[in-house]
Curated annotation (Swiss-Prot):
It comes from the Eukaryota. Interacts with PLK1, PAFAH1B1 and DCDC1. Part of a complex containing PLK1, NUDC, dynein and dynactin. Interacts with EML4 (via WD repeats). GO terms for biological process: cell division; mitotic metaphase chromosome alignment; mitotic spindle organization; protein folding. This is Nuclear migration protein nudC. Residues 168-259 form the CS domain. GO terms for cellular component: cytoplasm; microtubule; midbody; mitotic spindle; nucleus. Residues 75-97 have a biased composition (Basic and acidic residues). It is found in: Cytoplasm, Cytoskeleton; Nucleus; Cytoplasm, Cytoskeleton, Spindle; Midbody.
Length: 332
């Protein structure tokens, strides 16, 4: 059998042929065998039974590959389903604990590490600020940076700070997100165990509705952006909490709100580290890692990766032209 690299050599031509057969695969296969019968000696050129044997061997080979691929796909889907269920259960548990009033919460290792990182970043930012005050007060560059920061802060004034899951904790529900998906937990204060017939969950490409039957919906509005309806799902946890899993179509953006009626979160304060980098493709992962690096640099008042490149280019230009005076030059 041909190697995997050779398998797709004729895909374009065969695909064009397949598109011309309205009868589907059966008609395509019939055309192929008709070609062998009319234009070659496939059926009569060898020993009796050889053609049939070759067909059977080829069929068995590709059937085994197809069955193996299907088993692997089912295993992946089962793993993803289990991970989603565990994530939904964890989200539901957190939402349920929040509705039961304030209490002491034991941090997981991951949360403790994240909290320590935030503390370290805050200390670094304070140290950097102290150094800037001691060394470069009144410089035009610093004044412009401060004005720009004040302007950005003004635009984000009134926006919510993201929760640990890069979403929002609202009075009636809680949502978290990664670049590719979003999870929602809606707790219901009822004195009975919820069943599917008791709730209304309507997931559309750009609209979401969640609530109890016969009562005003808890969530009912236009989504921030489009979702894949066929890959989204919902379930009931502990008989009290409805959890909804949404697959984003655009996997390269952070949502600032779940539905249009929600208050916005400040997406500049999102921590990309809360998203699983291992789940992203190499291109997306490198982009997210760049975002993480730039975010750390900004928090410490240091130049981002793009700004560093510009500074390097400028430095090379200045080194190549020592005769030019750049002391009064201003750069954006």
């Amino acid at each position: 059998m041909g190697g995997e690299q050779e398998e797709d050599r004729f895909d374009g031509m065969l695909l064009a042929m397949a598109q011309q057969h309205e009868g589907g695969v059966q008609e395509l296969v019939n055309t192929f065998f008709s070609f062998l019968r009319r234009k070659t000696d496939f059926f009569v050129g060898g020993e009796e039974g050889m053609a049939e044997k070759l067909i059977t061997q080829t069929f068995n080979h590709h059937n085994q590959l197809a069955q193996k691929a299907r088993r692997e796909k089912r295993a992946r889907q089962e793993t993803e389903r289990r991970e989603k269920a565990e994530r939904a259960a964890r989200l539901a548990k957190e939402a349920k604990s929040e509705t039961s009033g304030p209490q002491i919460k034991e941090l997981t290792d991951e949360e403790a590490e994240r909290l320590q990182l935030e503390i370290d970043q805050k200390k670094d930012a304070e140290n950097q600020e102290a150094q800037l005050k001691n060394g470069s007060l009144g410089s035009p560059g610093k004044q412009e940076a401060e004005e720009e920061e004040e302007e950005d802060d003004e635009k984000d004034k009134g926006k919510l700070k993201p929760n640990l899951g890069n979403g929002a904790d609202l009075p009636s529900y809680r949502w978290t997100q990664t670049l590719s998906e979003l999870d929602l937990a809606v707790p219901f204060c009822v004195n009975f165990r919820l069943k599917g017939k008791d709730v209304v969950v309507d997931i559309q490409r750009r609209h979401l509705r969640v609530g109890l039957k016969g009562q005003p919906a808890i969530v009912d509005g236009e989504l921030y952006n489009e979702v894949k309806v066929e890959e989204s799902s919902w379930l009931i946890e502990d008989g009290k909490v409805v959890t909804v899993h949404l697959e984003k179509i655009n996997k390269m953006e952070w949502w600032s709100r779940l539905v249009s009626s929600d208050p916005e979160i400040n997406t500049k304060k999102i921590n990309p580290e809360n998203s699983k980098l291992s789940d992203l493709d190499s291109e997306t992962r490198s982009m997210v890692e760049k975002m993480m690096y730039d975010q750390r640099q900004k928090s410490m008042g240091l130049p981002t990766s793009d700004e560093q490149k510009k500074q390097e280019i400028l430095k090379k230009f200045m080194d190549q032209h020592p005769e030019m005076d750049f002391s009064k030059a201003r750069f954006n």
